[in-house]
Amino acid sequence: MGSFKVIIVGGGPAGLVAAHALHQAGIDFVVLERRGSVVDPSGASVVLNPPAMRILSQFGLREQLEDAGAELNHVKSFTNAGYNLGAAQVIYHRPELVRIMYEGLPSDARGKVLTDKKVTTIHQNPDSDTVTVSCSDGSTYTGSIAIGADGAHSRTRQQLRQAMIRDGQPLSICDDEKPYECAYRMLWCSFPRPDSIPPGLGGETQGVDRTLALMVGKASAMIICYEKLSEPTRERVEYSDKDMAQMFESFADWPVTETLRFRDVFDSRTAGMANLHEGIVKNFSKGRVCLVSDSCHRYTPNAGLGLNNGIQDVVALCNEIQAAVEQAGPESEPSQEGITKAFESYLNQRLKLMKKDLRGSALLTRLQAWASTLHYIMARYLLVPDWVQRLTINYVAVPTMRQAPVFKYIAAEEPYVGTTAWVHPIKPRTIT
């Protein structure tokens, strides 16, 4: 496949999925992670949906993932006064998920995941059809394309925007410097799972403009408190310990289960606080640089759609990259035209669902926080009956999930077979 090489900016879950995918395709890569360690012990919990589990199973990680995760099999809903609503959802401690994904890479591929690499500039070299990424430690990396998987405050996205401005593109076409709006903020903390709380339990405690959510894994649990801001903002906010303490006190007596309040389990040592970003960028690529996951779209976490969408981004993009490289042949590389076509095809596959899930996440956040009288009535009464939830699952969630793509070039056993068939079957292994 010639000397085609991909530079992945960001070593989080989406970046590691890209590393696995490119390794499986036989395409050279390097991952540049700004933190000192790939596995950050302070990470929050995440929920993987069946399409995401199916994709990670293509990497041979199914057994490790099933051992570490807890299926979300029981969900309870409360009001902040403690009344049981009864409602339904599936859990991972993020550091454990990242560890499994990182250690699941072969040793030679793990050696390409570099830490303490804070990206400063990304320069596209039109004369040589390459892109050069520079880091704050003075190191530089040159590749055929760069993939930005570096989060909500993406340096890759900033560099893409600056390149468009340098090329004379009007600001109305360019993304805002801060493209995501924040209407809510969150306080989260993780803690060892108490014996009184079974693995796989999820819960939500609803109030006016506020929600408390519980996710319980096998060894640890996570609580996230959501609160509406006094007014929306696009500014990045760094919250202090005092801010966290004040928000904690305002939620301290909210019920987590029938017998536990938030103050019973809160641990400030494993807590964090941040604004919740929402939005989708206008520009996903330019030249030889392309964005995936949080660098190009952000959802509130209530519906658990952020990482799951990021994984789908990587699947669609890497399928196109692999096809372009294969078409170019072993002695050549894809032309700029071929790269552009691959990036455009990726976006065409993903944009409609991105927008749909953005709307769905925003709606769920506002339902759970009783953002209006209508949201309150829907959350407390109209959406509570089991038959309504079954209809939502069977006629909204399942038809969407069954259409999720997989890596076309990775052969594996189909891990999930049910009454509803997947639209895109996994390539079967060839028996020799």
UniProtKB/Swiss-Prot annotation:
Its EC number is 1.-.-.-. The keyword Ribonucleoprotein does not apply. GO terms for biological process: antibiotic biosynthetic process. It comes from the Eukaryota. One of its GO terms (molecular function) is monooxygenase activity. Keywords: Antibiotic biosynthesis, FAD, Flavoprotein, Glycoprotein, Oxidoreductase, Signal. Pathway: Antibiotic biosynthesis. Its cofactor is FAD. Residues 1-19 form the signal peptide. The keyword Glycoprotein applies. FAD binds at E33, V47, R94, D294. It holds the Pfam family FAD_binding_3. Glycans are attached at N283. Belongs to the paxM FAD-dependent monooxygenase family. FAD-dependent monooxygenase; part of the gene cluster that mediates the biosynthesis of sordarin and hypoxysordarin, glycoside antibiotics with a unique tetracyclic diterpene aglycone structure. First, the geranylgeranyl diphosphate synthase sdnC constructs GGDP from farnesyl diphosphate and isopentenyl diphosphate. The diterpene cyclase sdnA then catalyzes the cyclization of GGDP to afford cycloaraneosene. PANTHER family: FAD-BINDING DOMAIN-CONTAINING PROTEIN-RELATED, FAD-DEPENDENT MONOOXYGENASE ASQG-RELATED. This is FAD-dependent monooxygenase sdnN. It comes from Sordaria araneosa. The gene is sdnN.
